[in-house]
Amino acid sequence: MNSISVLSNNQKVFYDDDYNRHEQLKDDLLEFLENHEDVQQRKTNVKATATDWNMKIKSRELDLFKAGVLDFMLNIPFDTGGCFRHFQDRRRFHMIDCWGNIYRKGDYTVDHTHLPSQYSWVYFLKSKPNYSPLLFDYWDQKKRKMKSVKILPIESRIVVFPSCLHHRVPVHIHDETRITISGNIE
């Protein structure tokens, strides 16, 4: 597990690149997502094709993956900062929602947070490292300007972060799709 400090108050973004069932998950979901209609109709922060907030697909692989995300949460040192200062019993975390985002050329996501959730995650199901990154924006007090922390969209990478962190995705400029699965945890 890797982490990157995002803000001066020690909030961190955690990520890992080796989900061991990535190929099975991709095989199970790719056709469903590539051909999915834009249920959200670009009325959310995601200006790309998006599924329902709770993806409507029966998938053993997706169920295993979501359980793996909750297991990943068990390894995060929650004393390193977050949106909420009260102690969270990590054994009681549960998945609130899980949706897919399908970025085609010209698509993007505007700056937003996932409040009132506690933690959120993004998984790069189909991507290349040169595709649009996930950007976490913050105010640099010392330099008195906005800065960004860039997370490369490496296929099979899971990124977990406090839901209060501002994040966005720049315009996707490639012909192939960039597909993520995202969710919130409480």
Where are the predicted features?
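Non-heme Fe(II)/2-oxoglutarate
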Residues: 1-90, 108
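Catalytic core of non-heme Fe(II) oxygenases with the double-stranded beta-helix
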Residues: 92-171, 176-180, 186
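Short beta-strand-to-coil "C-cap" segments at the C-terminal boundary of structured domains/repeats
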Residues: 18, 185-186
